[in-house]
Structure formats: C-alpha cells, structure tokens
C-alpha cells in the first residue's frame, strides 16, 4: 500500500516541479521491449509503470559501442535503457544480486541519443536530471521517449527490480551492460515524447518569460 502511495506522490511531485496539470495526463502500464507504435501513443506528462526487461547502461558502455565500434552483446531493439552504475553483490561467475540500483545524470550522454535510436531501435531512455533540447529531434525522428524519475528514490527503484538476469562486459564494472527484470517499475513521467514535446524545454521557457517580466518591472 505504501509503495503505491509513494509512487503516486513522486509522479505528482515531478509534474508540480515542471508546472504540468496532472488532470490531463494519462496513466499507462507498458511492457518492454516494445515497438515504435506504442511509444508514439505516449504524450509528455503521462505517467508510466513498466514490466518486463530494462537494460542498464552508462558512459563507458556507450563509448565502447559508438566510439570504439564494438557491437553490444545484448539486443537493444525496442529496449528501455536505464542510466545507472548499480551497487551489486557477486554470487558467482556472471551472477549478481542487487544492493542499490539508482539512476545517474543523463545529460552528459545526450550525444548517444541519435545513434541509439537510428542504429539500434532503442525506444526509451531513463535517468536523472533530464536531457537537453538537442535530444528532442532525434527522439521525434526515431520514435523514442525520455522517462524522468525522481532522484533520490533508489531504494524504491531497487525494490521494483526483481532480478539481475544478465551482465555483459564485466571488465567495465560497474558500468557494464545489465539486464534487469522489473515489475511495476515507476511511476515514470514522460518528460520528452516522440512528438517533439519536452517538459524540460517548457520549464526553461516559463523561467525565461518570468525573468523578462521581472526585468520589465524594474
């Protein structure tokens, strides 16, 4: 019961921070991997909970793929990518259990948005702090979304991850490729949708307009 209340509070908190009206936003439940059609049904501000599989990825993983030209050993088509370097406990060769799995800052990885969608068919990215405007057009063009999650909620996120099913490139620990099985992961807020809408951009524009109004009143 408390988990459900906590999830809803986190989503409403995020919508309040970005100035969106929760009464006009849809609540959705999705399973990943998924396809472009389902992604394009989402709109900025929607609340989404996720079942299925998500892929943990971070800076060094993507540098290996795109800068060094090494193909990833996991299928990323239709994938949900989580920006993370999780805290785990090793149980044996290739076997790990979760300790703490939170998110890391997404903005420094924005340059990978275009090739993730174009070359690998990635459908969703989730992390902390959002993505800048340069991610909006690649996400619109390739049918992708960015899911926002409230920072500092790693304990709840870890609980929603049922199992670490697979790990690749262990030499990059903890920035390996991770495959997590999740249940009711979220709520996540669609912060950038596949139609060119971004809650982050909207907030920046609101702040700019208010600043202009303040200066005009001096």
State each model region's role:
Residues 163-218:
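C-terminal binding/interaction regions
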Residues 56-185:
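Feature captures the catalytic cores and cofactor-binding loops of soluble hydro-lyases/lyases
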Residues 47, 53-57, 194:
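Short, charged beta-turn/beta-strand-edge "cap" motif at the junction between a beta-strand
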Residues 26-34:
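Short, structured beta-strand/loop micro-motifs enriched in basic residues and often containing a Trp
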Residues 36-41:
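Short, surface-exposed secondary-structure edge patches
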């Amino acid at each position: 019961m408390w988990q459900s209340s906590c999830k809803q509070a986190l989503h409403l908190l995020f919508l309040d921070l970005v100035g969106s009206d929760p009464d006009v936003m849809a609540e959705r439940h999705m399973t990943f991997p998924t396809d472009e059609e389902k992604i394009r049904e989402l709109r900025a501000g929607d609340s989404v909970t996720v079942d299925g599989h998500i892929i943990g990825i971070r800076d060094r993983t993507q540098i290996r793929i795109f800068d060094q030209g090494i193909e990833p050993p996991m299928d990323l088509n239709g994938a949900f990518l989580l920006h993370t370097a999780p805290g785990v406990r090793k149980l044996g060769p290739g076997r790990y259990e979760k300790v703490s799995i939170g998110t890391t800052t997404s903005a420094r990885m924005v340059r990978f948005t275009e090739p993730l969608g174009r070359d690998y068919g990635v459908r969703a990215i989730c992390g902390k702090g959002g993505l800048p405007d340069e991610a909006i057009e690649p996400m619109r063009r390739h049918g992708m979304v960015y899911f926002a999650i409230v920072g500092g909620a790693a304990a709840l996120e870890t609980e929603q991850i049922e199992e670490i099913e697979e790990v690749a490139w262990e030499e990059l620990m903890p920035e390996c490729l991770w495959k997590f099985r999740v249940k009711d992961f979220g709520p996540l807020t669609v912060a950038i949708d596949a139609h060119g809408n971004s809650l982050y951009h909207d907030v920046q524009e609101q702040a700019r307009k208010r600043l202009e109004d303040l200066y005009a009143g001096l």
